[in-house]
Structures are given as C-alpha cells and as structure tokens.
Amino acid sequence: MDNKKIRNFAIIAHIDHGKSTLADRILEFTNTVSKRDLKEQHLDSMDLEKERGITIKLNAVQIRYNSYIFHLIDTPGHVDFTYEVSRSLAATEGALLLVDASQGIQAQTLANVYLALENNLEIIPIINKIDLPSANVDKVKAEIENTIGISAENAILISAKNGIGIEKVLEAIVNLIPPPQASDEKDPLKALVFDSYFDIYRGVIIFIRVVTGKISVGDTFKFMANNLKFSVIELGISSPNQVKKEALFAGEVGWVAASIRNAKDVEVGDTITLVENPAKSPLPGYKKLVPVMYTGFYPVDSQQYNLLKDSLEKISLSDSSIIYEPESSKALGFGFRIGFLGLLHMEILQERLEREFNLSIIATAPSVEFQITRTNGQVQIISNPSLFPEPNFISEIREPYILAKIFLPEEFLGQIMGLCQDKRGIYVDLEYIDDFRRRLIYKLPLVEVIFDFFDRLKSLSKGYASFEYEVIDYQVSKLQKLDILLNGQKIDALSMIVHKDFAYPKARDLTQKLKEIIPRHSFEVPVQAVIGSKVIARETIKAYRKDVTAKLYGGDVTRRKKLLEKQKAGKKRMKSFGVVDVPQEAFLAILKTNINEK
C-alpha cells in the first residue's frame, strides 16, 4: 500500500454538534456501508450510546474514497471521556473540527482542539447545521479565529443531517491532512495500542496504529510496558465490520487477535514491537489519565460478588480508564472501590453492569482522594470517607482543587459566578471572547464539582454554558467527616466529607431527605447526623402501626390493653435487633442535597 494514499483523522466536536451524523454521512457517501445497512449513529455500537445520543467508546473504521484509504477514528465528546480522545488523536495526523453553526465553540471542543494542537495535527474547521434558522456562520468563523487562533476563512459549510457539503469534506481530507510518515518494512515495528475489547472466542482484541515497520500473521510481538509476549493469530481492518488481512503496514490502523486471555495484560497507550527486531524505545507523548472520583459498587445480592468481579474485569478491557480494588462495608458487605473520570462515566458503568451482566448494584456517593496528615506526621491518601481517622488524630486535611474554565453567554454571568461562590470557588479571571460570550475562570474544590455542579451549571444557563477543568494542586481545607446513624447504627457507606462551614445545613438537608426516602418500618427509626460523637441533626422515621385490636368484638377493655402492651414490647425488641432497609435512593440523596445552602 502506497503510504501517500493513506489519511488518518478524527472528528472533534462537542456533544450534539453532529459528529456521529457526519460519520454516518461519510460512510454512506463513500459506500463503505450501503444505504440499506446504514443505521443512525452507525459507529455507536452500544445501546446506551444511541439512547443518550452520545459517543462513549471510540471506534476505528477504514473508508475507501477514490484511490485513497481513510482511517476515521470516531471519538467521544463529553468532558469525562477526554481520555478516549487523547488516545485516538495520538493515532492520527489530522482532525475535523466540527462546530454547530447555532451554538458556536464549547469548552470541551476547545479542550480537544488543544489536545490536537499538542499532537501537531492538521485541523480542518467545519461548520455544521448551516440549514438551521438560528445558524450564524460569520459569528462562528470569528469565534474559531479568536479563540483557537486558526484561520476559518475556508471553513467548510455543511449540513450532516441533509448530506450538504460532504464531498467538500472528503476532498479537504485528501488535500489538507498529511499522509503518515514513510517507513521501510524492515524498520523495527512500533505500533500504538489505542483501544481494546474482549471477545469471548478470541480473547482480547487490540486496536493498533502502525507507526513504523509491519506486523504479520504468525509474528511474535511484545508490549513494551510490561514485556509480555504474544503471537499474532489474526489481524485485519474494520470496514466497519472486521476484514482479515495477512499484514498491517506503517500508517495503517487495524486490529490484532493474539489469544490474550488476561485483561490486565493490555495497557492502552502502550507500544507493541516485534520480539525478533525490537524497537529501542516506545512511542512518546502518551499520558495515562488518573481517575478524579471514587465510588463504592456493591451487589444487592451478596451472592453476585464474583459475577461483579468478572464483569468489571471484562468492562475494564474496553474502558482502560476504570481502576478498581476490593473493599468491604459493614452495611453493604463486599464490593469494589472504583475510580472514574466523572459522574457520567460512573452512571454509564453502572448501567452497563445492570444491562449487560444482569447485576443489581448499590453505588455509594462519590468521593475524591484527600491527603491527610496525622498528628504523628504520617501522610495518608484516602478516597473512602469511612476510612478517615478520628478528628483528634488529624493534623490537617488537603483536598484537590481544579482550574475550571467556563464558557457562557454574558446574560448568565451573575448566576454562574454565584454558583461558583456557593461551591467555595476562588475567582481567577474573566475573559471577553466576543460581544456576547465570556470565559470565566475559577479555582474550585474537586469534591464540589463531582456532585451536582454540571447539572446546576446547565440549569442556570438554560444549557448554554459549558466547562472544562484540570486538577491543579492540593490545598489545606477545614474538612470534617459527617457520619449517618440509622437506629443508632453507623452506616459507613453514607459517610461523607464536608466543609466545616457547611456541615450543619448539609446534615439537616441529608437527614430530611433520608427520612423521606427510607421506607417506614414496624419500629421507630431515628436518623442522626454526627461529627465525631456530636449529633448535629436528627429526624425520626415514624413506625407504621398494625391494628392488633381489629379482631376484638367489644368485651373486656383489659384484653385490648394486653394486646397493645404486647405489640409495644415486640416493637421495643424489634428496635434493638431490627435491620433498617436502606434503598439505593438513600445513597443518591447525597448527590442531590444542596450542599452549600447556608
């Protein structure tokens, strides 16, 4: 295959800007998929992706256009999935920057464009949805030039939905995106592993971009990070269905099956090379992202613990950003502490476990990693609030802070600044992008952002604000552990870390919510919020009362009293031994409480 005829590219776009639709039109226009077989969001393979209208997993597909071969790597657009975007961009030479003509550039688009610029990719600006009445092409062109600093004079105007301008996009890919670097077949193999998934018959299938050399069926290769060796049984390309080949050459994107049975053997972002003629060093520039929040996942049925363990292992193959370890809770039994990139990431994993593996999951409230200095000088990093030491053993607590960049229309500036102040934010800067749009920069505690910040941001701005963030440092904060007691028993899975100034309103709000959510029992259940040994808020869930006197037909009043006394004694006994049922909604209530309402 002539290297000069290959083009590798990704599509960068915010959610709902039409990325999956553009991918569909490209597949249709080039006859990669026949019109009869094409379905909406063709590259989005999960039902979840289609239902939510988002791309979660990245996909790679080979497209033939005239005498050229394109490798389109479809990427997610949500802030939680930046990890997936960084992988796909590392495997390409160019990117289509897709911007909605009515909404303009959003924060996440910008974050991904900067990733592309860091990778020295050729960027082609494309303005989509030009047929909408609210489209403002000139304004969007000016925005692209002012915020990104690339020329938008020759931006391609399209309507992906109606197929307008698709041919111009294909011609631009040919003319503007550079071909992969030429490489001799005899050069040592270097190939970037940018994705993987588990096939029950063939083991782990890895997706690779060959940078130098070639890889053939029968070759023995090794992963450079862990030195594990495997032999190629099958390899090929996706078009978009898998097509087997004998070899993959420099510049090509394809899949490799090598009977890899253990999920942990594959590290996405690793470099593979041949055992016979190995490369001296791996490919540069790959960064592994660290989870920003941690949550406990427990099976409702404790018998399903092993099924949950196996399911997590299988899912972690196709989502390498998930990190998990076993943990136990007095209230919930055995489960796992799982690291995520954000709340959407967590919701999607829970839905996948429930749909694909028929598991019922209880998820505890998310937390972040805190740095705790004990009074003896020892420093601990703890992400599970129930493992916090007692207050008298803590010298100081440091929490992670983020730098948040919020894009918003000027009319919502006041409300959004108010939201940031509520979340203990520190004002950094305000930039004027144009006459209508502003970029607000705040330092915020990460623990405040992972709860309901994104929802409230969208709600206050009617959906027009968007934001991106990066974790910058740890800062000392006045934090305390808030425990919840139900019927005098500490429920470790409901423990949380709160700021001293907001502990009381948070406790009051949470106890009221738990009172509404936890079903009534046949005995009275006190709900208490405590810090250390001090109760700072209390509610009582009233008992429901069975009418034990219903079967009496008049007669002696002492008989009635005797039955009521017997019921009272029974309830007293139940109260001391009774188990309180805590539904999943109780753990979610922690997310929904208005943390900082004083």
Swiss-Prot record:
HAMAP family: LepA. It holds the Pfam family GTP_EFTU. PROSITE patterns: G_TR_1, G_TR_2. PANTHER family: TRANSLATION FACTOR GUF1 HOMOLOG, CHLOROPLASTIC (PTHR43512:SF4), TRANSLATION FACTOR GUF1-RELATED (PTHR43512). This is Elongation factor 4. It catalyses: GTP + H2O = GDP + phosphate + H(+). Belongs to the TRAFAC class translation factor GTPase superfamily. Classic translation factor GTPase family. LepA subfamily. Required for accurate and efficient protein synthesis under certain stress conditions. May act as a fidelity factor of the translation reaction, by catalyzing a one-codon backward translocation of tRNAs on improperly translocated ribosomes. Back-translocation proceeds from a post-translocation (POST) complex to a pre-translocation (PRE) complex, thus giving elongation factor G a second chance to translocate the tRNAs correctly. Binds to ribosomes in a GTP-dependent manner. GTP binds at residues 16-21, 128-131. NCBIfam families: lepA (TIGR01393), small_GTP (TIGR00231). Residues 4-181 form the tr-type G domain. It is found in: Cell membrane. Its EC number is 3.6.5.n1. The keyword Nucleotide-binding applies. The lineage of its organism: Bacteria, Bacillati, Mycoplasmatota, Mycoplasmoidales, Metamycoplasmataceae. It comes from the Bacteria. Its main location: membrane. GO terms for biological process: positive regulation of translation. It is a peripheral membrane protein. Keywords: Cell membrane, GTP-binding, Hydrolase, Membrane, Nucleotide-binding, Protein biosynthesis. One of its GO terms (molecular function) is ribosome binding. GO terms for cellular component: plasma membrane.
